[in-house]
Amino acid sequence: MTTMNISTLRLDSNPITTSTKSTTHRSGALGYNGSYSCRLLQFQKKNKAPSIIVCSTKPLASVVEHQGVNDSGLTRIESLSQVSGVLGCQWGDEGKGKLVDILAKHFDIVARCQGGANAGHTIYNSEGKKFALHLVPSGILNEETICVIGNGVVVHLPGLFKEIDNLESNGVSCQGRILVSDRAHLLFDFHQEVDGLREAELAKSFIGTTKRGIGPCYSSKVIRNGIRVSDLRHMDTFPQQLDLLLSDAASRFQGFNYGRDMLKEEVERYKKFAERLEPFITDTVHFMNDAISQKKKILVEGGQATMLDIDFGTYPFVTSSSPSAGGICTGLGIAPRVVGDLVGVVKAYTTRVGSGPFPTEIMGKGGDLLRFAGQEFGTTTGRPRRCGWLDIVALRFCCQINGFASLNLTKLDVLSDLSEIQLGVTYRHPDGSTLNSFPSDIRLLEQIKVEYEVMPGWQSDISSVRKYSDLPKAAREYVERIEELVGVPVHYIGVGPGRDALIYK
């Protein structure tokens, strides 16, 4: 197998920026002369429509004003509103958990509002111990923080208890600190089995589910035969509810074998689960609104990301909930007027797990190189993530939907060895006309041409940098160009996986 050194990559000679099929140079020699040379490349990516790379001019001074910069970040964090949120701006895996973990010590409550165990957040404690959380909010490592699992979350109890056991065995106290909504729906093992059966049925239009049972559980919720956490308090009627749910699955999927022994075993399991869960069960709607009245500070931790939103994402290659701003209110039972600052988390490049449109994807060895440099493998599934350049069109769309007050740009350090970096700034129809917004039509997304700006890399290690002014000039220009293109300031910049590897801007 041929090895590649990321530090030797150049736009004109490596698969991270050129086609494996053909490349046609349109405007002379490639390369920088200190003032951003103009050039035009046209290349094919597998069977996709050709993408276009245009010259970038010298970055203008950002139209975004930056005020109140504090090296410690304390002023920046404490200025966040009473109810703030951290949401993903891409297709998930942006690094939301790290920011939530850092912010949590300044908030009384951290809450999950949607999704389930398909949301994988990796965080590290002060000793560098790694925790992969799927249901428990990332604020759990901060001893004084209360963690809420809201009504919009679907809860797999075996998975939840496994996370709690792992945390407590590593010295993290969970008793009295995790509150589970009595309105949250229960996700059963059979939901996971059904998820796999349904995926097999749809093999020709493979969506790429995590097979965690999220879709089937939300389906049960919507058709109104789901079972909620509060139902565990009524074990006299629980068997009938579960029988209805299992019978429905058996009638729908021939491969699902359901018998009375299964029902009996599940009922006995859930009697024990109910007893263990009881101390955690809470009317979280009342709890949250009471906390707001008491001026408690609340941080909402979004799962997945806006581009996976059931309404606004690349449907049907999406999740089954609303991981955008609207999901905060419906998933926690709080009023829109109380929601304040929302921070959007976005990688310095783009990744996606599973199938679906990905306009700025880098194909071949170039994508592999970026994947290994960024260790892009799913927290939940372990699957390799598809990698590509930062998609400004999609990011701007996410900023419009969510009304972000600021952005957290993560993994800037992963790009450190590249000689040149690209930003996907414009989508064009196959006929060359410009798309004015992010399209809902996935067929069109597969055909569009992406117009890129090319910027110089900084080719130096920035993982130890903690002040924005100490970043290389090219790195600062990259950050400021993103701000200029989307109209939202970048307040946090990730330069490594550790808690301290964060620049406050």
Curated annotation (Swiss-Prot):
Mg(2+) binds at D93, G120. Its EC number is 6.3.4.4. GTP binds at residues 92-98, 120-122, 385, 411-413, 494-496. GO terms for molecular function: adenylosuccinate synthase activity; GTP binding; magnesium ion binding. SMART domains: Adenylsucc_synt. PANTHER family: ADENYLOSUCCINATE SYNTHETASE. Belongs to the adenylosuccinate synthetase family. Homodimer. This is Adenylosuccinate synthetase, chloroplastic. It comes from Nicotiana tabacum.
